[in-house]
């Protein structure tokens, strides 16, 4: 499948945004409790898609796998921009 030169729209509903945020928080705490660097592990998972970056501890691996990685990235970007004073629509 080839790429198109036209802009494609991607939309995530508000309920999913909230659930992704809660899931990332829970996964962060699980990673921290197990002695991992949570940021590095989450980035590793998001970039590679390899669930081995997230432990099974507290069901963290299954929780994060409920969402597509692009949905996780969208929520992270939204949160970052809002935290820097940008009115994200």
UniProtKB/Swiss-Prot annotation:
Signal peptide: none annotated. InterPro entries: IreB. PANTHER family: UPF0297 PROTEIN YRZL. Belongs to the UPF0297 family. This is UPF0297 protein SPy_2114/M5005_Spy1797. It comes from Streptococcus pyogenes serotype M1.
């Amino acid at each position: 499948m080839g790429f198109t030169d036209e802009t494609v729209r991607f939309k995530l509903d508000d309920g999913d945004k909230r659930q992704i945020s809660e899931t990332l928080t829970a996964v962060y705490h699980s990673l921290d409790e197990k002695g991992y660097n949570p940021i590095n592990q989450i980035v590793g998972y998001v970039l590679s898609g390899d669930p081995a970056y997230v432990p099974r501890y507290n069901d963290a691996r299954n929780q994060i796998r409920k969402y597509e990685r692009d949905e996780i990235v969208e929520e992270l970007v939204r949160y970052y921009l809002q935290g820097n004073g940008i009115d994200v629509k």
